[in-house]
Amino acid sequence: MYKFAVFGNPINHSLSPNIQNQFAKQTGFEISYDKILAPVDDFVSSVQAFINQGANGFNITVPFKLDAFKFANELTLNAKIAGSVNTIKIEADKIIGENTDGIGLIKDLTHNIGIKLKNKVILILGAGGATQGILFPILKQKPNQVIISNRTHSKAIRLAKNFSKFGNTCSFSLNKIKYKSVDIIINATSASFDGRIPNIAFSIANNAVCYDLMYGYQTPFMSWAKTNHAKMISDGLGMLVEQAAIAFEFWTGAKPDTKKVLSNLRR
């Protein structure tokens, strides 16, 4: 039996056990998958105890992705560039860190929603860890431009500069975006979690695809997008399922059917 878990704080809300158990049933693997509340100031002790129990791997969510990045002794290219880890695989003495967030987002946008990113103008709201985790996979799709916008403009400037070698990036503060329209808007801020709407011009949502990394309810960002005539609106549930599938394949080598799981969760 494979032994897996997800670490976070808080963690009760996590859908990961449900998703991973559905994948296991599909593919014929026997797994255990727990939710583990790690102390904010002692992530390492929690994961080390889990590893000592014979763990095969685990997922990491807020606020421990940077801690997991530091804890891993081997990193994939995605994890190195993202600077954070959301999936770890244990192989003997190897603690291999991966970041599946960005690839999960791309798969949801392209496979589930049917949106191509090539030659598109993409606006990303926020310049924190969530944005850093998705930028490299987005730029690999060869969009025309990726605009990073953040309340603290210096963070957006730094992120745009750091990723400029992978594609065409630029930055603006949230209330000074100099674009009248874009093709895709991705909300990677915590505004929806806090019940707030990002401070950006209403007109920019007109006829755009609007995607919120948050999931589970009609977020304030999604309501804002609907009011302002977005062409298509989605939450991040598909991304959650797709990134979980990549983690499952990373651990087991088996590729699960995400559409069935996503359909079950949408019911």
UniProtKB/Swiss-Prot annotation:
GO molecular function, one term: shikimate 3-dehydrogenase (NADP+) activity
NCBIfam families: aroE, PRK00258.1-2
InterPro entries associated with the record: Aminoacid_DH-like_N_sf, NAD(P)-bd_dom_sf, SDH_C, Shikimate_DH, Shikimate_DH-bd_N, Shikimate_DH_fam, Shikm_DH/Glu-tRNA_Rdtase
The protein's name: Shikimate dehydrogenase (NADP(+))
Substrates-to-products reaction catalysed: shikimate + NADP(+) = 3-dehydroshikimate + NADPH + H(+)
UniProt cross-references to Pfam families, sorted A to Z: SDH_C, Shikimate_DH, Shikimate_dh_N
UniProt xrefs under PANTHER family: BIFUNCTIONAL 3-DEHYDROQUINATE DEHYDRATASE_SHIKIMATE DEHYDROGENASE, CHLOROPLASTIC, SHIKIMATE DEHYDROGENASE
Annotated active site: K65 (proton acceptor)
